[in-house]
From Swiss-Prot:
This is Small ribosomal subunit protein uS19. One of its GO terms (cellular component) is cytosolic small ribosomal subunit. Protein S19 forms a complex with S13 that binds strongly to the 16S ribosomal RNA. The lineage of its organism: Archaea, Methanobacteriati, Methanobacteriota, Stenosarchaea group, Methanomicrobia. PANTHER family: RIBOSOMAL PROTEIN S19P FAMILY MEMBER (PTHR11880), SMALL RIBOSOMAL SUBUNIT PROTEIN US19 (PTHR11880:SF2). GO terms for biological process: ribosomal small subunit assembly; translation. Coiled coil: none annotated. GO terms for molecular function: rRNA binding; structural constituent of ribosome. It comes from Methanocorpusculum labreanum (strain ATCC 43576 / DSM 4855 / Z). Belongs to the universal ribosomal protein uS19 family. InterPro entries: Ribosomal_uS19, Ribosomal_uS19_euk/arc, Ribosomal_uS19_SF. NCBIfam families: PRK04038.1 (NF003121), uS19_arch (TIGR01025). Keywords: Ribonucleoprotein, Ribosomal protein, RNA-binding, rRNA-binding.
Amino acid sequence: MAKKTTKRMPKRREEYTYHGYNIEQLKAMSMDELLAIMPSGARRKVLRGFTRDEEDVRAKIAEGDGVRTHSRSMIILPEMVGKNVAIYSGKEFINVEIPVEGVFHYFGEFALTRKKVTHGSAGIGATKSSKYVPLK
């Protein structure tokens, strides 16, 4: 009996929605409508008002791509999705294309300030047994 093979279709990714709204609907909403569905931390930050630096970043992102910023505390709004932003990590600027899933998160969440530590092998004299290893 011959084995029947079926070709598996690649898993289709569903369209991202935030509280039932897709990204086009979020972009079309007014700020008051967005405030109603924002998480409380982002809502309080928006209600307090953006700083001058954050307003400048927002204006530059609206003009076009390729913005460099130190404002890690800027809230990602729906109008920023898909834009390229260089976010300062404390050492260098990290280029980030803002994903759809990043709406209402902070810029700083996408530019990490610490690297993951990768430990190497122990050096000579680090352990008692390694003292007698011949040097090359």
